[in-house]
Amino acid sequence: MENIKLNPNFQFQWEEKQNCYVLLYPEGMVQLNQSAGEILNLCDGTSNIEKINKTLCEKFEVEDLTKDITVFLIEAKNRDWISYE
C-alpha cells in the first residue's frame, strides 16, 4: 500500500483557541473534527491506510476503522490535502 503524506501547501497544527486541529493555507483555515485530526496527524509519509487503522484501533480500542478512514482519505485527496507516495 502507498504511504500518505500531507500536501506541503497546507500547515497542519493544533489550534489551542479552537481546541481542534486545523489546516492552514494561504487563503484561510480549515477546522477539523477529532476524527479528521487524528487521521491527518498520522499522514506523515511513512504510514499507509493499514498502519493508520492499526494505530487508531489501538488508541480508541475498536475493531476496525478502515472504512471510515478510507472515506475520509478520499475526501482529503479530493480537496488536495494529501497525496500518496
Per-segment meaning from a language model:
Residues M1-N41, F60:
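Acidic, low-complexity/disordered tracts enriched in E/D and polar residues
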Residues M29-E85:
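Long, charge-rich, low-complexity alpha-helical segments
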